[in-house]
Amino acid sequence: MQISVESVNSIKKKLNFEIPADKVSAEVDKAYAEIRKHAAIKGFRKGKVPMSLIEKHYGEKMAEDVVKNLVQESYFSAVSEQGLNPVGYPAIESNPLKKGESFKYSATVEVFPEVEVKDYTGLAVVKEKLEIDDSVVAARLKEMQERMSQLGPAPEGHAAAMGDFVTFDFKGAMDGVYFEGGSAEDFQLELGSGRFIPGFEEQMVGMTVGTNSTIKVNFPEGYGNADLAGKPADFEVSIKEIKVKELPELNDDFAKEFGEEFETLDLLKAKLAEMNEAQEVSRINAELRDRLIKALIEKNELEVPEALVDRQAQMMLESTKQRLASQRLSLEMMGMTDDSYKAQFRDNAREQVKGSLLLDAVAEKEKIEPTEEEFEAQLSVIAEQTRQDLEKVTQLYKTNERAKDNLMAQMREDKAVQFILDRAKVTEVPKAEIK
């Protein structure tokens, strides 16, 4: 068998094969013999069908089987012998199969790039300075108050305000004609929730129980009903009831509602401040990591296989869909499809692939590997984060080789990032100064 390898570019190879005629003939005979065992042709017993009839009825299938066998055997053998590291499946081009003649075909496949990483020490990056905003804790307490609030009747003469719950009747008309789906009775709406057409809720502010008024709005251009989209409408509104939120007082009793450990409001505030600081530190470090990897990529431009980019884009898509599902949302609700998402974030996927390849090269060059002790410690972190029993988590990762390999690969990458960060020139600056 003759094999030659062409470099289409740094990440794509073309393997050309010529398989000898005697090998082709042997495979053809073997394929016919196998088909003959099971061939069912009227007038002949299985295994006794003449070869001429088998060729007539099964010649096309035979050719497919032979080509498949020849390609599989020769391609994987050549990949191993040539020391190639393919990404994905090859694109096969071949001549027609003819018994008694050699079989020629080519296999074009993307391969992992040979990464010669450089200039990964002394990278200049900026890090956001940690600045604690006390208003965040106040805002969080306000959210907690809102969550524990109860609705009570508004005082007599109360003018509706944002945040109030208003019960009302409405009828919508266009050019004086009421339209289908534009009316309701005893409809309840929280002003400021954004559930109605833009401008509708704002015009209800200031109304009192018993008010009868007309609200003028324009349906958005992209409104779901094409008959209404972009058109003006008048809504007759009759206010029947207004309820206001009654917020619990911020005191020690309020704090105790969130756990026995919060005996005082100050303890609750301290915990919220601690959580906010931890979140800010995590965000700042994640953004620093992104800048560090971006700086590494700028020093080491490289081509990456499209198959790896496809794979990363698919992983990003699945992760996003899971996150949206946890929030009872979907891509469709965001106005996107699987394909449009992957197209929009393809460049991000490409940069992530570049970063992973470069970090892997740094780890290889610096002999960076997570230790067994670090692996055990990470299992404890996972157990704590997922609120699972440590023994259960340990069993999962020690019996699932793929899960363990993925975790070890992530830990290796994290250690490579830390190695580069320890040797980087990091400048802390206020958030406002970061571009």
UniProtKB/Swiss-Prot annotation:
Keywords: Cell cycle, Cell division, Chaperone, Cytoplasm, Isomerase, Rotamase. Its EC number is 5.2.1.8. The keyword Cell division applies. It catalyses: [protein]-peptidylproline (omega=180) = [protein]-peptidylproline (omega=0). Residues 163-248 form the PPIase FKBP-type domain. InterPro entries: PPIase_dom_sf, PPIase_FKBP_dom, Trig_fac, Trigger_fac_C, Trigger_fac_C_sf, Trigger_fac_ribosome-bd_bac, Trigger_fac_ribosome-bd_sf, Trigger_fact/SurA_dom_sf. One of its GO terms (cellular component) is cytoplasm. It is found in: Cytoplasm. GO terms for molecular function: peptidyl-prolyl cis-trans isomerase activity; protein folding chaperone; ribosome binding. Pfam families: FKBP_C, Trigger_C, Trigger_N. GO terms for biological process: 'de novo' cotranslational protein folding; cell division; chaperone-mediated protein folding; protein transport; protein unfolding. SUPFAM superfamilies: FKBP-like, Triger factor/SurA peptide-binding domain-like, Trigger factor ribosome-binding domain. Involved in protein export. Acts as a chaperone by maintaining the newly synthesized protein in an open conformation. Functions as a peptidyl-prolyl cis-trans isomerase. Consists of 3 domains; the N-terminus binds the ribosome, the middle domain has PPIase activity, while the C-terminus has intrinsic chaperone activity on its own. NCBIfam families: tig. Belongs to the FKBP-type PPIase family. Tig subfamily. HAMAP family: Trigger_factor_Tig. PANTHER family: TRIGGER FACTOR CHAPERONE AND PEPTIDYL-PROLYL CIS/TRANS ISOMERASE (PTHR30560), TRIGGER FACTOR-LIKE PROTEIN TIG, CHLOROPLASTIC (PTHR30560:SF3). This is Trigger factor. It comes from Citrifermentans bemidjiense (strain ATCC BAA-1014 / DSM 16622 / JCM 12645 / Bem). The lineage of its organism: Bacteria, Pseudomonadati, Thermodesulfobacteriota, Desulfuromonadia, Geobacterales. The gene is tig.
